[in-house]
Amino acid sequence: MDFNTLIEIFYTLYKERTAVYPTNSSESDVKKWNEATLDFFRIQLEPYVFKYLEHTYGAALDAHWAKHVFPKKSRFALVIVERRCHPNWWFILRNIAWAAPYCSLYIFCSNTNQAVLQSYLGDKADTVHLIPWFTGDVSRDEGRIQTNITFKTAEFYKMIDADYMLRFEMDTYFLQKVPEAIFVGDFYGSPWGWVPERPGGGGLTVRKISAMIDICEKDRALIDPSGEDAWIGNAIVKYGYSVPTIEFRSQVFLENSPPHSVPIGIHQFWTFLMNFNIQDRSAFEKIIRCLVTLAV
């Protein structure tokens, strides 16, 4: 898939979504529109993004992958929690090996996708921490609940032999090499536009392991049904843990705000294009090109 094809698909779906935006409507109407369209467009666009990335950069990343060996132990760990046989595995494994070769890799999988992951890893399986954390197939909602519980559990963090971890979801990727300098503070993720002063979160988050264990073992009354990143963010604020400035965080990760510079990591930006306030197709193409161009 070439860039022009990707843009045509993106722009068509973007216009479809904006065409049904409830202008001059109540906050409730806008919320209903968002709930009705956001997940649909996220699912529609994601396969095209990764198809383009694999087509454009797959060969170069695969060449690096062939020579790469994950360190069994490092101060910095990449951590993936994923129980599915996800279609993005091939690209993501090569992307992280290229972007952060000094990091160890922990994959918390299930007994249903462990064998598939071993085949993807091939001769690298012996140097990757592949941990069957989940059992069986569950519904999407139940899977989300179990994942949130995992990140609120001290025992989970105690299994990661590192000072820092970078949590990495299956709809994320790195545009640039990951410098060790991003591993600072106790917790942060992509800035959230509606609460920019908070630690943020999303599919890419940096976490200091000792701080996560401390938080999970502190006040158990903090636990609530919210997403794990919001839950940890609340504890970070409550107990006065360290968070980098929003200026720093904006240069590291991007999720739901327009880019002011090229970030290091991306999390499903295609879901939040409405937030970018794009006025014309030329500007649209410029932003999309920025967010799908890897420094390979």
Language-model-detected regions and their locations in the chain:
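N-proximal low-complexity "stem/linker" segments adjacent to membrane-targeting elements
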Residues: 3-94
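Short beta-strand/turn micro-motifs composed of small residues
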Residues: 80-82, 107-111, 189
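Short, solvent-exposed loop/turn segments at secondary-structure junctions
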Residues: 83-86, 111-114, 134-136, 171-174, ...
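Short, acidic, metal-binding catalytic loop of nucleotide-sugar glycosyltransferases
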Residues: 94-103
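Active-site-proximal specificity loops/subdomain of glycosyltransferases
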Residues: 108-163
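Short glycine-/acidic-enriched loop or helix-start segments at secondary-structure transitions
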Residues: 117-118, 175-179, 216
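GT-A fold catalytic core of metal-dependent nucleotide-sugar glycosyltransferases
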Residues: 153-193
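Catalytic core and acceptor-binding pocket of nucleotide-sugar-dependent glycosyltransferases
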Residues: 199-296
